[in-house]
Amino acid sequence: MAAGAMRGLAVAGGGESSDSDDDGWEIGYLDRAAQKLRGPLPTEEKNETFKKALTTGDISLVQELLDSGISVDTSFRYGWTPLMYAANVANVEMVQVLLDRGANASFSKDKQTILISACSARGTEEQILKCVDLLLSRNADPNMACRRLMTPVMYAARNGHPQVVALLVAHGADVNAQDENGYTALTWAARQGHKHVVLKLLELGANKMIQTKDGKTPSEIAKRNKHVEIFNFLSLTLNPLEGKLQQLTKEETICKLLTTESDKEKDHIFSSYTAFGDLEIFLHGLGLEHMTDLLKERDITLRHLLTMRKDEFAKNGITSRDQQKILAALKELEVEEIKFGELPEVAKLEISGDEFLNFLLKLSKQCGHLITAVQNIITELPVNSHKIVLEWASPRNFTSVCEELVSNVEDLSEEVCKLKDLIQKLQNERENDPTQIPLIEEVSTWNSRILKRTAITVCGFGFVLFICKLTLQRK
């Protein structure tokens, strides 16, 4: 390995390096450094051999040196300890050995902690995650900041490690802490374009409205650095992910965030996506990311998923636990259900006036909910196509569905008008029948008002859908 590369490994996390080119890690000094010790060495030579063993990852030689009496917390040039160097290159086995030998996990030099060194290490997220977990298990402080007031979670966010971020927060790291420039972990993730870290931080309760010292929010920082998709996502008025995990205990959070860690390949595929679709957003918000590949393999869209029956869930390999999460989410979204199974009873003329009136009231209320839903969609729908965050199918698909909706509403309006005319006819016949006791005027007036209100509501819903159709066609 080249000397330059070794010097790069020895630079402190966060870019706080020394002015000198000599970092105290000479490489070609002793041939026997890579071999087992053949006899007692002078203290200075032991230190050099120790450094060589650390940089080459020679665990057996490190153990032999420690057995010979060298301190596990030996201070090398610039005050770094062996554990700090091992953490900075994400050598999990070496970190484990040094900790087991009593190395101080809370050591810091010029406010550069071992945990910060691990979070800014050059290695895979799996290696870094294990190193951080080992250090946290030895009571390393997740909130101790460096000279620039950057905490470990900020380094993990800046370097694009969502699982490391989650682990730190689960151990008490302040997700909204700010550095000397007012940057939070979310700001750093937005600045570097780490979308998967942004989503994880929002789940953990990161405040997207915190401003930097120059008055910029994370979304504005993302826009300035040309991360348009992150800017669009952070600019949304409502965020279904925000604070989703805040109320969990530390153990629950660790379990929730790391249960899928065993499937490394799937996690990597998911975390390296280029754009979220509506299905992915829905699953991610429920913590069901592991279902993404399964549903895509079966060509199941979000619309199909939301309309599945219970037998279809099982048929498509969706477990009972996952079914419960999806059904619970649907229950929160659904409006008051009308029992349309009662409709055939109307034809038998056995239904009471109160029951029929109740049915009409429910129908009117349902139409009102639908009108409100469409109005909300029209309000939230982006005016410009570049503001759309999710992957959308061709607008023609949406337009055709809207046309179908308008047609259905027109049919519904026509049927309600027929129903109104029929009831009016029955009412007139009853009023003219001498054998019938006249109805109380107030009740008759009230029934008439209900029918009129229902008809007007249905017509209004049709008008709203028509406007929605025109809006989509213009886009």
Curated annotation (Swiss-Prot):
PROSITE patterns: ANK_REP_REGION (PS50297), ANK_REPEAT (PS50088). Keywords: ANK repeat, Cytoplasm, Developmental protein, Differentiation, Meiosis, Phosphoprotein, Repeat, RNA-mediated gene silencing, Spermatogenesis. InterPro entries: Ankyrin_rpt (IPR002110), Ankyrin_rpt-contain_sf (IPR036770), Asz1_SAM (IPR042650), SAM (IPR001660), SAM/pointed_sf (IPR013761). SUPFAM superfamilies: Ankyrin repeat (SSF48403), Pseudo ankyrin repeat-like (SSF140860), SAM/Pointed domain (SSF47769). It comes from the Eukaryota. One of its GO terms (cellular component) is pi-body. Residues 272-334 form the SAM domain. GO terms for biological process: cell differentiation; male meiotic nuclear division; regulatory ncRNA-mediated gene silencing; spermatogenesis; transposable element silencing. Interacts with DDX4, PIWIL1, RANBP9 and TDRD1. Plays a central role during spermatogenesis by repressing transposable elements and preventing their mobilization, which is essential for the germline integrity. Acts via the piRNA metabolic process, which mediates the repression of transposable elements during meiosis by forming complexes composed of piRNAs and Piwi proteins and governs the methylation and subsequent repression of transposons. Its association with pi-bodies suggests a participation in the primary piRNAs metabolic process. This is Ankyrin repeat, SAM and basic leucine zipper domain-containing protein 1. It comes from Atelerix albiventris (Middle-African hedgehog). The lineage of its organism: Eukaryota, Metazoa, Chordata, Craniata, Vertebrata. The gene is ASZ1.
